[in-house]
Regions:
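Auxiliary Fe-S-binding modules of radical SAM enzymes
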Residues: 44-46, 131-338
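Conserved Radical SAM active-site core
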Residues: 1-145, 311, 334-336
């Protein structure tokens, strides 16, 4: 594992005395302060990269949390004001008012935080409202370039909730929405659908337009959807392969953002992020690096050492001979070798 996901209720101290008392007893003035301390401790003690989903945030909160978390997120769910009316799913949830969530997306862009967001389908919204929600995300992303992932999440009815008997969206609605998201955001945006919410139809979901399964943990349940267990990674790999794609790991911060580290990652996290990525911004598969005499090189490197390339261009051969002789290589020569 390379990520520690923090997902929590939004500022419970504003509503519940028990939350205020618990925070005060631990010495924190707010849940945001507590979250900062917890994420900082996890990062320093384990080296895992925190990804935070704490709800709506003010600009100063985002700026502070960004120093302990390379990425954050909040689901927009929908821009439909209609869903906030009495008798509708978002009634009585002021944190889900569309303007409030859109402002958090805007704040994240201003703060330069790589951000995950998305929509929830099957809660009474229309197809038009889904498109409007995706376009609202796109508008903010075009201003700031910070949205690294769009989640298309299908509603699942849960026990002990007011919507326990609400109908769930069918596969056709999910596939339609994924396809529309891909059209609206183009080929470069990462689009995700949670695999544990659609078992048995994963190849169809891939074909609809996703390129990411989101976080799939081998050690914890999905705490947001505990009734829906994660697929085993081996099974997910087979399902992905059956759709003609290759399953590979990524960090919580996407490759393009990790590579542009000066813009998107807080300086306190630079060293760790760089340690974890290869030249393409993907997670490294081993701890070895050139010049490390204490760690066994990976199989690919050992194979190249044991069975070296027999035909080298003259300039590469000359650079290698210089290196063997102890000559300090120029930057251009090092680039040529790679």
């Amino acid at each position: 594992c390379k990520e520690a996901l923090f997902t929590l209720g939004e500022k419970p101290e504003l509503r519940y005395r028990a939350a205020r008392d618990a925070l005060a007893e631990m010495g924190y003035a707010s849940t945001t302060e507590y979250l900062f301390a917890a994420a900082e401790a996890v990062f320093k003690e384990t080296g895992l990269l925190p990804h935070l989903n704490p709800g709506n945030l003010e600009p100063e909160e985002l700026a502070k949390l960004h120093s302990v978390s390379p990425s954050m997120g909040i689901m927009l769910e929908s821009v439909s004001e209609r869903l906030c009316e009495k008798g509708m799913p978002h009634y009585g949830s002021p944190d889900k008012i569309p303007a409030v969530r859109l402002q958090t997306l805007e704040n994240a862009g201003i703060a330069g935080v790589p951000f995950t967001t998305g929509i929830l389908i099957g809660i009474g919204e229309t197809r038009l409202e889904r498109v409007e929600s995706l376009l609202a995300i796109r508008d903010i992303h075009l201003r700031h370039g910070h949205v690294q992932e769009i989640i298309i999440q299908n509603f699942r009815a849960k026990e002990d909730t007011k919507m326990v008997n609400a109908p769930e969206p069918d596969l056709g609605e999910l596939l339609w929405t994924i396809a529309v998201a891909r059209i609206l955001f183009g080929a470069t945006m990462s689009i995700q659908a949670p695999p544990n919410l659609s078992p048995g139809v994963l190849p169809q979901i891939v074909h609809a337009g996703i390129n990411d399964w989101g976080g799939v943990s081998p050690v914890t349940p999905d705490f947001v959807n505990p009734e829906a267990p994660w697929p085993q990674v081996e099974e997910l790999s087979r399902e992905t392969a059956s759709a003609g794609k290759y399953l590979t790991e990524r960090l919580t911060i996407y490759p393009a953002y990790a590579q542009d580290i000066e813009r998107w990652v807080h300086p306190d996290l630079h060293e760790r992020v760089l340690e974890m990525i290869d030249t393409e911004g993907m997670p490294r598969i081993d701890e070895w690096c050139p010049g490390d005499v204490d760690t066994q090189p990976p199989e690919e490197v050992m194979s190249a050492i044991i069975n070296p390339v027999k035909h080298l261009s003259a300039d590469v051969a000359a650079i290698i001979e210089d290196a063997k002789a102890g000559k300090e290589l120029t930057e251009a020569e090092i680039v040529r070798l790679f």
